[in-house]
Swiss-Prot record:
First and last residue of the signal peptide: none
Gene behind the chain: udk
Name this polypeptide is given: Uridine kinase
GO molecular function: ATP binding; cytidine kinase activity; uridine kinase activity
Pfam family, one: PRK
Amino acid sequence: MTDKAHQCVIIGIAGASASGKSLIASTLYRELREQVGDQHIGVIPEDGYYKDQSHLSMEERVKTNYDHPSAMDHNLLLEHLQSLKAGKPIELPLYSYTEHTRKKETVHLEPKKVIILEGILLLTDIRLRQEMNFSIFVDTPLDICLMRRMKRDVNERGRSMDSVMAQYQKTVRPMFLQFIEPSKQYADIIVPRGGKNRIAIDILKAKISQFFE
């Protein structure tokens, strides 16, 4: 491995949908970026690695179980993490929540000292876990996650309340219990109460800051 590979630190943040993962990731990114600069830290959302469904009709796309590991292109994510560790840039895929497939455009991402990786299914894949220097599970009660998800999907993603509730009952909750919650055992740190747990965020900041020394 190259010196660059030793310098790239991968931190995984997992948890239920609407548990506060993205808030913790964005807070850590924003506050650490102010300390070390944009060139040293980046964020990769797992959502961008939902499989491309542009070949499917909209009717078929909405039937996809987005909370099952098979919906993710973890092979591509693994390839990208390994590229960053090897000092190579990647083209970060983007996902459209309204079109239910990948966008045509990508975001160019250069290797960073620290990469924060966040998503619901990260800890279910042993290959991804092996690339992480340490991992976090955001442990938020499901009823709170549902309320947050309802508000987010209706206001930001153009969903109806009925469709959000139907999806929650059919796939979100069952897949959480089958895949996501059991993956909590692999986390090095468990954060209760979601993205507004300031004490936990400060502890995580202190831990991550060690990698910049």
